[in-house]
Design a protein with these regions (language model features):
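C-terminal motif of bacterial Sec signal peptides marking the signal peptidase cleavage site
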Residues: 16-19
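Beta-sheet-dominated interaction scaffolds and their linkers
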Residues: 23-69
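Short solvent-exposed strand-capping/beta-turn motif centered on an Asx-Ser/Thr pair
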Residues: 63-69, 79, 125-127, 142
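Surface-exposed binding patches on compact interaction domains or structured appendages
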Residues: 67-115
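Terminal connector regions
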Residues: 126-156
């Protein structure tokens, strides 16, 4: 009877260790904005009064924290009047938005330990018109994803 209790107790302890995994699963990548890690579901507000460029530059970094290289998809979901703004996203080159509400971009083979700068530009079609809106970014490598919202406020140029 003592032997059965010993094996039962040992099995419970073993299952507990296996289910807990001995710690958290390491995050394969982090997204940084202004030097800080962007938490999942974060909201970032961007205000601009740049009268020379009349656009809203916004950039973030994706850093590979894993031991392997992998590709990352960036989904841009726009929530604003698509006739008032033009956007482009720059990874290794700048690619204009396709006029759709949602677009997916790919960073191919991000090496282990490296980071990739992502530039996003939003330009008003008519710089004198004030406008507000938001863009939801989702970054995913297929197994792990994080998302954040960028809210922008363009006051217009007089």
């Amino acid at each position: 009877m003592k032997l059965v209790k010993f094996f039962s107790l040992s099995l419970i302890v073993l299952l507990t260790l296996v289910s807990c995994g001995g710690g958290e699963t390491p995050v394969p990548f982090n997204v940084y904005f202004d030097g800080d890690i962007i938490e999942d579901k974060a909201t970032i507000t961007v205000n601009t009064v740049d009268e020379i460029l009349s656009e809203m530059p916004f950039y973030f970094f994706i850093e590979n924290e894993s031991d392997n290289s992998f590709s990352v998809n960036i989904t841009e979901k726009r929530n604003y009047d698509l006739t008032k703004f033009e956007s482009n996203l720059c990874i290794s080159q700048c690619l204009p938005g396709n006029g759709e509400e949602t677009q997916v971009w790919t960073v191919d083979n991000l090496p282990s330990g490296f980071s990739q700068k992502i530039d996003y530009h939003l330009s008003p079609v008519d710089p004198s018109t004030p406008a507000k809106g938001e863009v939801l970014f989702t970054v995913s490598n297929g197994d792990y994803s994080t998302s954040f919202t960028v809210i922008f406020d363009f006051p217009g140029i007089n």
